[in-house]
Amino acid sequence: MKKLVGVGLLIVGMVGGSLAAESHADQVIATILENVRKIKAVVPDAVPMAFWDFDGTIIKGDVTTGLKESGQVRYKGMAELAILNGFSPFYKGEKGAAEFMHHDYPHLRSFARWLAYPLNAQILCGSRASKIDEFCVRQFDESFASWYFSSSVRILRALEEAGVVNHILSASPELFVLAARKTLGLPADRFNGIRVAIDGGVVTERIEYPLPSEGGKTEILQRIVRSTPHGYAVAAFGNSYVIDADFLRYVVTQPPLPNGAKGTSMMINGGTPPPAFDGLFLCVEQDDVVGPAKK
């Protein structure tokens, strides 16, 4: 397969049937839009919203830590790339990147995710946010966007075309996931990641809460819905029963939506549901990506 050129422009232009996807994509699009139709029949100015995890849900792999398959690195994550390109005062060069990626971060994550996830953003302390953004946007344009799941992009674009407002809820640094805005065709204010305070254009170590992980994702979702006149959460997408299941469950068990409409939640490549979540979500497997993952 030929290398994609200008992959960002390619993805933004893909809508409806123009993007190959697994069979479940059409099913979930139809289900969500039928429920949107029910809501708008009685609330014409309703604002239907869909909420998406990012890593493993929209992109195959993890924007922060990358993707490794069968012992082969498919792409390096933004954390490693940021270190290698001088955006961290704490970790320098190949040695620093290896220390962070193979020791410090996985060790901390093994017993304290609530500390490990913010660390991915805090290592950027002292760098200019605009320079990090330029760098990360370029990574998406040149390579990361080719790892988007075809089905996820197709669903997201079809919902957006139909007037559903898509929001991102990610436990990766917001500086990383925000860089996907151009390739996904979403405005910047739809992205919610691990957020650090920016002081005079410079990244600080101060974390803003709640963290968009586990119950924090649900809290952010509810805040967005409450702040949107006639806003309704109609869909949720995730891939982890640990990180995402709470907000997915909220969407399908929330107080009744107008006119008998129901929320739809899709778990992607999540494996066997734990008993507490059995039967709640549409569980699917997907692997096809937009770009040249297979050669």
Roles of regions detected by a PLM:
Residues 53-55, 61, 65, 73-79, ...:
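Conserved cytosolic headpiece of P-type ATPases
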Residues 11, 17-54, 59-62, 69:
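Non-catalytic pre-domain segments flanking phosphatase-related domains
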Residues 24-31, 42, 47-49, 129-167, ...:
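C-terminal cap/substrate-recognition subdomain and adjoining C-terminal extension
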Residues 4-13:
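Sec-dependent N-terminal signal peptides
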Residues 64, 70-154:
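A metal-dependent, Asp-based hydrolase signature
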Residues 12, 117-120, 179:
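Preference for short coil/turn "hinge" residues that link or interrupt alpha-helices
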